[in-house]
Amino acid sequence: MLRNCLKSGSLKLLLGGLTLVLTGLSQSNSFALQNRSDSNRLDLTPVALTKIDEPAGQTGDWQPLFNGKDLTGWTPKIRFSKLGEDPLKTFRVENGMLCVNYDQYEDKFKARFGHLFYDTPFSSYDLRVEYRFVGKQLSDGAGWAKYNSGLMIHGQDPATMTLKQTFPASIEVQLKSCDPNGKGTVNLRCCTPGTNVVRDGKLFTPHCFDSTGPKVPVGEWITVVIEVRGNEVIRHKVDEEVVLEYQQPQLDNRIPEVMNGLKVSEDVVKSWYKDKSKPEDFLLTGGTISLQSESHPVEFRRVEIREIK
């Protein structure tokens, strides 16, 4: 796979969130949340970073989230459609595979971003996914969405998403591919819609950052494992090799402007965060798992989880 061309518990997040345009801000090496009072940020006190200890052990076997027959346990949320509605059958099962398909879109994506949510949220677990990209991107899909999909983890409850919301507030494990000539981005990058993470002891606010993962040609199957340990650490792995690691996933506590030219008022965002009075309240300890649709077809033949107790 490493060739050169190459989501238990009753936890439920009640926040809404949108993909944010994340801008840089000054930060202290010892803080996971930065304190800053201005018109573009909620007034918070920093949270000190704590030592991250590896969990004591693993409990249980791998359990399938996708049963290979139907979408039992999964619920779609397509932009501009109500929760549970998938009018163009974007997410379907064909030949034992969970397919993200656009054959009813008439070659026009029209920014109808979608997510297929597993109904149970999770906190500490290993997530194993086998997938491949196929076919061609829809003609009006964004340039960055070619050979691009995602695993959204620590995500918001889809029932709290707005009708026009593009992505759930979450941590995105970006699934990528490349063309036969190797043109494309490395696999298993991280993006942070409505969130931030800590890297090297510092709050990291750019929207996406690279991994050392391989480039994977379109049409080729690849298996990846995502190690998620609550709010402690998240690791992206290919063939047992860690290609990206970061800590303390958390909601972005700045008043946002949303990607794609959409605006969200300060009052709306404050209403989302009304139960968040302390910096610790913004730390993400778990949430939903979802599979993304961004305009390029992708197939999954295995989606399974191993919970960590």
Positions of predicted regions on the chain:
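Boundary at the C-terminal end of the N-terminal hydrophobic targeting segment
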Residues: 26, 30-32
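Carbohydrate-interacting regions of secretory-pathway proteins
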Residues: 33-309
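N-terminal secretory signal peptides that target proteins for export/translocation
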Residues: 1-9
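Bacterial N-terminal signal peptides
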Residues: 12-26
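Short N-terminal alpha-helical targeting/association segments
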Residues: 4, 19-21, 35
